[in-house]
Amino acid sequence: MSTMNKEKLKGLQSFLKDDIWRVTEDEVSKSRGIFYNAIKIATLSIREFTQGRIINKASALTYSTLLSSIPILAILFAIARGFGFSNLLETQFRSGLEGQSAAAETVLGLIDSYLIHAKSGIFIGIGLIMLFWTILSLTYNIERTFNYIWQVKKPRTLYRKMTDYFSILLLLPLLIVLSSGISIFMTTMLKNMEDFVLLAPLMKFMVRLIPFILTWGMFTGLYVFMPNTKVKIKYAIIPGIIAGTAFQAFQYLYIGSQIWVSRYNAIYGSFAAIPMFLLWTQISWSICLYGAELCYVAQNLKNYSFSKETRSEEHTSEL
């Protein structure tokens, strides 16, 4: 490497390490200011994610999710059956576990068993209490993690937890069925428009884009709704898109790794679904929580005061 290139590289490193933190929006053009802010947000979010040990928080949520997965799915399927679209929800669930049909059948069997025992005989009261307690426990842990990221000390009241979280549980099956209906509608239209050479590629693109749009909306809503503080939606949209895209990419990688899954089947046999589910949940929560860090840093970037004379920065949270 030539001396000139070394000097340029050294200058770039110095700029990214020190100088960029001293630049204010008034000193540069609007486009360059946006670019610099993006670098600051990415750097600070990674630092907060690692120093805050958010991976450990993701592991704790993975454990809570493992304990709560069957009760939550049981409630979703019970609501779906009440509205008469349990078959659509089951289809979506099976497609989500594509390549692991045995695991899907096992989980569906556990859901049916859970619903039967929760509403039969003397166990109906205990079963319902345990079901609601399990769900409240998971949602409390999720809110506590988001509040930790946002440095919020006060959680929701019990009344707000009951109303807010169970409203989500009522809406979630409807959203799943709506997404399934849109996908079926678009696919049907695509088959009928195969003769239209110009429109067919556009329709294919729209069908493939639907899961991404729904995932972007889900993460954006989560970042706005879950912390017990005011989160401006404009700061949640881009983190929601980034996290949603990463989540969808991981989904495709996870579903497409048939050789990887078969190796686990050879080692664990019928229990192979458990480590795979743990791995999927851990990575999914890590993606979700990093997006929450992005959202937090984006909204509070102006509250990081960077000294022009020193390399240190001070921070106050906007809550």
What are these regions (language model features)?
Residues S2-S317:
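Membrane-embedded alpha-helices and immediately adjacent juxtamembrane helical segments
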